[in-house]
Swiss-Prot record:
S-palmitoyl cysteine-type lipidated residues: 133, 143, 156
N6-acetyllysine modification, residue list: 5
One of the GO BP terms on file: regulation of cytosolic calcium ion concentration
Name of the protein this chain belongs to: Caveolin-1
Organism: Sus scrofa
Function, as annotated: May act as a scaffolding protein within caveolar membranes. Forms a stable heterooligomeric complex with CAV2 that targets to lipid rafts and drives caveolae formation. Mediates the recruitment of CAVIN proteins (CAVIN1/2/3/4) to the caveolae. Interacts directly with G-protein alpha subunits and can functionally regulate their activity. Involved in the costimulatory signal essential for T-cell receptor (TCR)-mediated T-cell activation. Its binding to DPP4 induces T-cell proliferation and NF-kappa-B activation in a T-cell receptor/CD3-dependent manner.
Modifications made to the protein after synthesis: Phosphorylated at Tyr-14 by ABL1 in response to oxidative stress.
UniProt cross-link Glycyl lysine isopeptide (Lys-Gly) (interchain with G-Cter in ubiquitin), position: 5, 26, 30, 39, 47, 57
A Gene Ontology molecular function term of the record: transmembrane transporter binding
Homology family: Belongs to the caveolin family.
Keyword check for Cell division: no
Keyword vocabulary terms for this entry: Acetylation, Cell membrane, Golgi apparatus, Isopeptide bond, Lipoprotein, Membrane, Palmitate, Phosphoprotein, Ubl conjugation
Length: 178
């Protein structure tokens, strides 16, 4: 039973006891205190970003991973000069690299702003409109489902049970005649 330390008005140092079983206001005080010491709280707005691996969830592995060999290929028997091939490779690679950088410099921040607004609106609508509508619908449909269930058990179950008993006695004999 130990806890945090505090100093009273006379300057005496005291420890605040933390009970093993907790109390009605803070159950499991000791366990909670130990967890808080071990865990670091991370905020989504202040987390560090990885400048080396910019696609940690591999969203674009199959989509935009386009290299020179994926676009331009010369089959056997149809080859250009080696110098032309090397220059084409360099031109393609450098152009793609710098044009992407130019486009991301010009449109990256505005597009991030637009997508941030879009996903904020989408999250807002999902939290404050879609989920409450679905919950409301599920609550309202319960009375209909009960009436429907009574109807099925009263009329449909006996009917299909009788039909099943009728057809359960049908026997088919297959004979092969020579």
């Amino acid at each position: 039973m130990s806890g945090g330390k505090y100093v009273d008005s006379e300057g005496h140092l005291y420890t605040v006891p933390i009970r093993e079983q907790g109390n009605i206001y803070k159950p499991n005080n000791k366990a909670m205190a130990e967890e808080m010491n071990e865990k670091q709280v991370y905020d989504a707005h202040t987390k560090e970003i990885d400048l080396v691996n910019r696609d940690p969830k591999h969203l674009n592995d199959d989509v935009v991973k386009i290299d020179f060999e994926d676009v331009i290929a010369e089959p056997e028997g149809t080859h250009s000069f080696d110098g032309i091939w090397k220059a084409s490779f360099t031109t393609f690679t450098v152009t793609k690299y710098w044009f992407y950088r130019l486009l991301s410099a010009l449109f990256g921040i505005p597009m991030a702003l637009i997508w941030g607004i879009y996903f904020a609106i989408l999250s807002f609508l999902h939290i404050w409109a879609v989920v409450p509508c679905i919950k409301s619908f599920l609550i309202e449909i319960q009375c209909i489902s009960r009436v429907y269930s009574i109807y099925v058990h009263t009329f449909c179950d006996p009917l299909f049970e009788a039909i099943g008993k009728i057809f359960s006695n049908i026997r088919i004999n297959m004979q092969k005649e020579i």
